[in-house]
Design a protein with these regions (language model features):
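His/Asp/Glu-enriched, well-ordered alpha-helical/loop segment
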Residues: 338-347, 355-378, 382-383, 388-392, ...
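Beta-strand-rich structural segments
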Residues: 27-29
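Non-cysteine beta-strand/loop elements that form the S-adenosyl-L-methionine
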Residues: 291-309, 398-409
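Divalent metal-binding segments
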Residues: 20-24, 35-280, 295, 299-356, ...
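N-terminal signal peptide c-region/cleavage motif recognized by signal peptidases
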Residues: 13-14, 18
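Sec-dependent signal peptide recognition
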Residues: 2-8
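Acidic (Asp/Glu)-rich catalytic clusters
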Residues: 256-259, 283-292, 373, 394-396
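Short, conserved secondary-structure segments in the cores of folded domains
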Residues: 33, 41, 502-505
């Protein structure tokens, strides 16, 4: 069992120590701001910030410090997930989880069991199915769902969030029929008679969203607390929240004013927000203790590879009539980029397919030439399948690829089918980016993938799944070293949020955000990195999580 310390500790309590704190007898690692790996056995922090790292000589320098026994555990900076969905994670923890389903039938039985336990809920909502892992690999249908739950609407998001599986009741409520047109950037999957089958892809999901029950503040509280509890237990002390609406924007501001955020959050305002212009005019949001920083916008280029929604320059190798979907129309890119960059906000653009990536790079170049914004550390979120000629442009344009290592190990079972061997030369190209000097910010894209950052570190270094398959790793030339992976989850993730001077390491003056873990990831076999257990998580010198014995 795990024990989470109260997430609503006052931030001030982290800043009013009577004496410095000194943790000793640790195997500590951090990167300095130049990227050099430093090892240490002792660390002293005061007022929530690191004041020294070193060896036993710190005992003489700080004789009155409060002593903390490190018990020879490994100490690392708190890990940063550079792309996750905080409320989505909390929501998934409170809904039916279909990631372990072995077939469509297995999934509907899980949904039925959940619906029976939650009879008071007006909708049955879940997430995590992946037809690629099921026999036949075909999309499931509304008719199958109807056999098990037909008295209330059901909405089940695919593992990547880019498709939803719904029952007939949900289609009826949304008014989706044979005559309903596909919305721009979306697709209603139909049978050979044109009738909706129960699968909605990308923007077609919006036809259903407006009918979902409104999210209350109590629901937001439950979601944030559940997500925070899990992330702290996995060693994550800061997360870049990839796409929030006005309700969550206001809620985060309320929680930070109450000194009750469970971890540091760097939210990206969703470009689809109806009040985007209003929020941009309010300027950046930054609290004095660096728990909340809002200075970026998440825009949406295309869908996902698994659902064949990623926008490709040439058709899918396994679907010759399909180029994928542009979620934001090409003609809308210029005004959107100009708006965001013109207000001095970092623009983080979701692009998975090579067409979406090229369009993003083209528009960044155009907007930079006219209104500036090149220094804002703009990002491409995912940057998964890229034409090899476009990779150097990331460096030229100062665009940070924000990438998720476990996407590669999850997608390796279908990526070649989708795009063919030739296009894989520019896919999941972490080492290529690093060799050209591009900082790579690593994350997980939770709840699409599991949030555990040690799963990401393992995938980045081995290019294997947690069964250590394939033997030599998938496209092993793009694997990174442990140090490079560590940097992607610390210093470079902090850099991607303009926070490298306060987070991402444990050098003097940075916040004392750190974790104790049970094994040395720099010394063990890379295949075992994913097994790492977090023993303690600290933020600003306050312990926020302890793993129970």
């Amino acid at each position: 069992m795990k024990k989470i310390l109260a997430g609503c500790l006052l931030f001030a309590s982290a800043l009013t120590f009577a004496a410095p704190s000194h943790i000793s007898n640790v195997r500590g690692y951090t990167l300095d701001n130049s990227g050099e790996l430093i090892s240490f056995s002792n660390m002293v922090f005061d007022g929530g910030k690191v004041i020294a790292i070193g060896g036993s000589e710190l005992n003489e320098r700080f004789p009155n410090a409060t002593q903390i026994a490190g018990q020879d555990n490994v100490l690392l900076p708190g890990l940063i997930d550079a792309h996750g969905h905080v409320m989505g994670l909390g929501e998934s923890l409170l809904q039916v989880d279909l990631r372990e389903s072995k077939s469509a039938l297995d999934a509907v039985k899980m949904v039925q069991a959940y619906a029976k336990k939650q009879q008071n809920l007006p909708w049955v909502i879940g997430r995590g199915w992946n037809q690629v892992l099921w026999p036949g690999k075909a999309y499931p249908t509304a008719s199958l769902l109807d056999e098990y739950v037909n008295n209330k609407p059901v909405m089940l998001s695919r593992v990547d969030g880019h498709a939803s599986w719904v029952n007939s009741k949900a289609l009826e409520i949304a008014g989706i029929t044979k005559d309903t047109l596909d919305p721009p950037g979306g697709k209603i999957v139909r049978d050979n008679q044109g009738k909706p089958t129960g699968i909605l892809v990308d923007n077609a999901i919006d036809l259903l969203y407006k009918h979902l029950p409104k999210t209350s503040e109590n629901t937001l509280t439950a979601q944030l607390n559940a997500a925070g509890e899990q992330l702290l237990s996995e060693g994550i002390t800061s997360v870049h929240d990839a796409g929030i609406g006005k309700d969550v924007y206001d809620y985060y501001k309320k929680r930070v004013a109450e000194h009750s955020l469970p971890l540091r959050i760097y939210p990206m305002i969703a470009a689809t927000s109806p009040v985007l212009k209003q929020l941009l005019k309010t300027d950046h949001v930054q609290d004095q203790y660096d728990w909340l920083s809002i200075r970026s916008v998440k825009a949406y280029g295309d869908g996902a590879l698994g659902s064949r929604g990623a926008a490709l320059l040439n058709p899918y190798s396994d679907d010759a009539e399909n180029h994928g979907l542009l979620v934001t129309r090409e003609k809308d890119l210029k005004p959107l980029f100009d708006l965001v960059l013109g207000h001095g906000f970092q623009l983080n653009f979701h692009a998975i397919g090579d067409k979406a990536n090229r369009l993003a790079l083209n528009q960044f170049a155009d907007s930079f030439s006219r209104i500036g914004g090149k220094s804002l550390r703009n990002r491409v979120e995912h940057a998964q399948v890229i034409n090899v000629d476009d990779i150097p442009r990331f460096k030229t344009l100062n665009i940070i690829p924000a990438m998720q290592p476990t996407h590669a190990t999850s997608d390796m079972n279908m990526a070649k089918d989708r795009v063919g061997a030739d296009r894989l030369k520019g896919a999941y190209a972490w080492q290529t980016f690093l060799k050209q000097g591009s900082p790579v910010a690593f994350g997980s894209d939770f709840p699409v993938e599991l949030s555990n950052p040690f799963f990401g570190l393992h995938a980045a270094v081995t290019r294997q799944n947690r069964n250590n398959s394939p033997d030599s790793g998938w496209i092993p030339s793009e694997a990174v070293t442990v140090k490079q992976a560590f940097r992607g989850f610390t210093l470079d993730a902090a850099y991607a949020a303009h926070q490298e001077n306060i987070l991402g390491g444990l050098t003097k003056g940075k916040w004392a955000d750190f974790i104790l873990i049970d094994q040395d990831v720099f010394a063990i076999s890379p295949q075992d990195i994913w097994k790492t257990q977090v023993l303690e998580t600290w933020i600003a010198g306050e312990k926020r999580f302890t793993k129970a014995p």
